[in-house]
Amino acid sequence: MSSLVTGVDLPPPSLYRKSAARGGELARAERGKNADSLRSVRQERGEGPTVLFDIETLRSAADVGGWDKAHRMGIALAVVCHLEEGRFETFLEPRAAELAATLKAAGLVVGFNSRRFDYTVLSGYTGEDYARTLPTLDLLDTMVERLGRRVSLDHLTKETLGAGKTADGLQSLQWVKEGRFDLIEEYCRRDVELLRDLYLFGRREGYVVIAERSGRIKVPVDW
């Protein structure tokens, strides 16, 4: 744990939390900070665009016989953030090949548990080993390297940004059964927005925040 710095002076996790009085001010300030971070990304990554993505599945691990069979789960939909363009794109299952092509065209693909999960789901359509071939920054891998254990995206964004997920994978699977792909898209896009903001915060500040029994702690990152 020597790489961790006790956050005695950390601000409360309300960076993105909108109060009635200061919501607009905080939002404008954060947009300005993100714009600065994006300029830095553009300057440093000349070899191709940066994309962030997340996949929601049609079937659960129980449906397909275990997490080791994620390639059978199928794509309900995926959301991609084209970072430098500030644009989001949604891919339904029939566009799985286009999703793969979009990721292949990127200079950097950012995800959360993407190496083990999202890439495996996508490989069910193409047979390709994306964890080996794509330039990837998996933020979960970074946390495991720093902490020696896994930590959820929801925990990281709540502690670092003051904003969390709006649903979870089980709820998404229920929406699949109900045919509510509009709600799945809203949920998945929110996850990608959180991923983007966490990534940009880490680039700009050089750390993210977790909560331990001893208090809130800064975890250095160098992405």
Q: Where are the regions that the model predicts?
A:
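DEDD superfamily 3′-5′ metal-dependent exonuclease/proofreading module
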Residues: 1-223
